[in-house]
Amino acid sequence: PTSQRLKNYRKGQPDYYLEELYYQFGRYLLIASSRPGNMPANLQGIWHNNVDGPWRVDYHNNINIQMNYWPACSTNLNECMLPLVDFIRTLVKPGEKTTQSYFGARGWTASISGNIFGFTTPLESQDMSWNFNPMAGPWLATHIWEYYDYTRDLKFLKETGYDLIKSSADFTVDYLWHKPDGTYTAAPSTSPEHGPIDQGATFVHAVVREILLDAIEASKVLGVDKKERKQWEHVLAHLAPYKIGRYGQLME
C-alpha cells in the first residue's frame, strides 16, 4: 500500500514508482482545480474543511499562486494555465491605478494578496516588511510569456499576452532607481516575507531581469516597439549585479 511505501521512502528506500505517483497526483490537483472558464487555483485549491479557509482562501502573489502553476506547461497542461492568464488580465485595470497612486509609474502591478475582485494594493495596516511587494505583478506577468513560450500561440501573444508583458515591463523600468554609479536597482525592495525593507533584493532583481527579458523577446517576435526594446535592453544591461557573501553564498 501507498502508506507503507511512504514509510519506506522516508527511511531512504528508493521508490521511483512512488515518485511518479506523486508527480501524477500533482497534475491531478491542478487539473481538478484549474480549468478554462473558471478561477485559478487558490491557496487551498478547491479543498478545505471550513466555510472560511485559511488566509481567506485568497491568491498570494508572492510565490503561492506562481508555485501552483510552475508544473502546468512543463507537464503538458497548457489549458490549465488559462484560468491564471484570465485572472492576470483582470488585474491590469486596478493594477494601473495602484502603480499611479502608489508609485507615480506607468503600467500595472499587484501586491502580495489578491482576490476575485481585482485587489492589487498592499494590505491595510499590515507590516510592510512582508506586505510590500510591488514586483508581484511583474512576477505574475512572466507566466504570460511562459504560456506563449510553450504553446507558440502567436495570436495569443499578439492579441492578449504582449500588452500585459509590455505594461508590466514599463512599470518595472519606472520603479527602478538609477543610481549615481550608472546602475539600476529596486528601492525600496524586500525578499518576500523575509527581512527588512532595503534596496536591491535579489528576488526583486531576478523578477526584473525575467520580465525585461520576456518583454524584449516578445517585442522581437512581433516586430514591434523597437524604441521601448532599446530601453529595456539598456536597463537590463545596467541592472545592479547580484551580491555574493563572504561564504560564497548568493545574498538575499
Feature locations, PLM:
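Alpha-helical scaffold segments in carbohydrate-active enzymes
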Residues: 21-32, 87-90, 94, 163-175, ...
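Alpha-helix C-terminal capping/termination sites
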Residues: 12, 19, 31-32, 68, ...
